[in-house]
Swiss-Prot record:
Described function: Required for ribosomal protein bS1 (rpsA) to bind to the 30S subunit.
Post-translational modification N6-succinyllysine, affected residues: 115
GO molecular function ontology, one term from the record: structural constituent of ribosome
Protein's recorded name: Small ribosomal subunit protein uS2
HAMAP family reported for this sequence: Ribosomal_uS2_B (MF_00291_B)
Similarity comment: Belongs to the universal ribosomal protein uS2 family.
BP-aspect Gene Ontology terms: cytoplasmic translation; ribosomal small subunit assembly
Subunit annotation: Part of the 30S ribosomal subunit, contacts bS1. Some nascent polypeptide chains are able to cross-link to this protein in situ. In collided ribosomes contacts ribosome rescue factor SmrB.
PANTHER family: 30S RIBOSOMAL PROTEIN S2 PROKARYOTIC AND ORGANELLAR, SMALL RIBOSOMAL SUBUNIT PROTEIN US2M
Length: 241
């Protein structure tokens, strides 16, 4: 199963927190000390906590669970999308729309509209419209794709959230808490760990660190899914006998 070592984390700068004046005292148990007014995260805590989170995500994936990757900060946006797509999962990487989970009924209608517009753009419907109407629908399609493209094939609520930056994505975390969906999150020294089921104390800004987390999560999800496919193949083989 995918794991991450302390050496990997040091190389990626996972241990660098935020400036000491921005700290959240609830993160004290995970802070090693401070250097040049910047908090240093205790990787002896982070390594086992991250590997425990990976093991749990592996289990969820092996049960066909759906994992939603959330990271809407510009720096993490593309990496979040790439990681989710690489393991056939789902993502929100631009803006978290309030009610995305708690108001799923409405979101489902917007997804239906998105799919209708996609069909229209491909089957020649747009070509039959006036220039103005076609432009309006194209803009609507782009807007919906931007906000819902990563979840349009999710087909229902996710079984877990993997979040980059608990502070920035606090609305998503709150919605998941309300619905009892487990939250796995990178929590920096300025963030509140409350509401996060699997806290991963670490740098949430450095792109190398973010890429390290996402790469490991995507790998463990792929492994979990292949276990599920292998067991399905075994079952059908037994039935065939």
């Amino acid at each position: 199963m995918a794991t991450v070592s302390m050496r990997d984390m040091l190389k990626a700068g996972v241990h660098f927190g935020h400036q000491t004046r921005y700290w959240n005292p609830k993160m004290k148990p995970f802070i090693f000390g401070a250097r040049n007014k910047v908090h240093i995260i205790n990787l002896e805590k982070t390594v086992p906590m991250f590997n425990e989170a990976l093991a749990e995500l592996n289990k969820i994936a092996s049960r066909k669970g759906k994992i939603l990757f959330v990271g809407t900060k510009r720096a993490a946006s593309e990496a979040v999308k790439d990681a989710a797509l690489s393991c056939d999962q789902f993502f929100v990487n631009h803006r978290w729309l309030g009610g995305m989970l708690t108001n799923w009924k409405t979101v489902r209608q917007s997804i239906k509209r998105l799919k209708d517009l996609e069909t229209q753009s491909q089957d020649g419907t747009f070509d039959k419209l006036t220039k103005k109407e076609a432009l309006m629908r194209t803009r609507e399609l782009e807007k919906l794709e931007n906000s819902l493209g990563g979840i349009k094939d999710m087909g229902g609520l996710p079984d877990a959230l993997f979040v980059i930056d608990a502070d920035h994505e606090h609305i998503a975390i709150k919605e998941a808490n309300n619905l009892g969906i487990p939250v796995f999150a990178i929590v920096d020294t300025n963030s509140d760990p409350d509401g996060v089921d699997f806290v991963i104390p670490g740098n949430d800004d450095a792109i190398r660190a973010v890429t390290l987390y996402l790469g490991a999560v995507a790998a463990t999800v792929r492994e979990g899914r292949s276990q599920d496919l292998a067991s399905q193949a075994e079952e059908s083989f037994v039935e065939a006998e």
